[in-house]
């Protein structure tokens, strides 16, 4: 009998506490808003980190595949400076960054999309078959028109531009008017990609 009474009192107490906490949370907008903002921020950052990791993995595997098969390609990653003028020249799309899609674009040499560049914004492909201004720099004769246009874009914006040579299969990056050859090792290449995309 005593045990039942104590159990009943405990349940009543917990129920009242639960009701009080719910009422407090709903009545106190500041508390509620803080909780909502906190959880939204945590979820948003987690999703952004996952999107970024997937993008780095996909970009690395795409560049290596194109390199092995010696398929020429230009992939420009937009940073702070808008690339809208070049997006408008090409074909606007809206697609996740997919190695399969990029292979379809660059492997078909008879397609008009083959020679142009792909532009990426916020980890999504937003333009294909875009063309950039050629650099006027005197560069190594081993570099072709893709390298010259990638370098030209990097001189006019803070975009990071990745190039695969159709002749040698070498992977390069153009950034701030400078072009550099990247590693063909998967892990080192991904480290380099992360480094250049994280630079300010």
Curated annotation (Swiss-Prot):
SUPFAM superfamilies: YojJ-like
This protein's UniProt keywords: ATP-binding, Cell membrane, Membrane, Nucleotide-binding, Nucleotidyltransferase, Transferase, Transmembrane, Transmembrane helix
Catalysis performed (reactions): 2 ATP = 3',3'-c-di-AMP + 2 diphosphate
Membrane topology: Single-pass membrane protein
One term of GO molecular function: ATP binding
GO biological process, one term: cAMP biosynthetic process
GO cellular component, one term: plasma membrane
Entry keyword annotation includes Glycoprotein: no
Chief subcellular location: membrane
Knockout mutant characteristics: Probably essential, it was not disrupted in a global transposon mutagenesis study.
Domain spans labelled DAC: 28-185
Pfam families: DAC
InterPro entries: C-di-AMP_synthase, CdaA, CdaS, DisA, DNA_integrity_DisA_N_sf, DNA_integrity_scan_DisA_N
Transmembrane segment boundaries: 5-25
Location relative to the cell: Cell membrane
EC primary class: transferase
Enzyme Commission number(s): 2.7.7.85
Keyword RNA-binding listed: no
Summary of subunit composition and partner proteins: Probably oligomerizes.
Family assignment from sequence similarity: Belongs to the adenylate cyclase family. DacB/CdaS subfamily.
Function, as annotated: Catalyzes the condensation of 2 ATP molecules into cyclic di-AMP (c-di-AMP), a second messenger used to regulate differing processes in different bacteria.
Protein name: Diadenylate cyclase
Annotated source species: Mycoplasma genitalium (strain ATCC 33530 / DSM 19775 / NCTC 10195 / G37) (Mycoplasmoides genitalium)
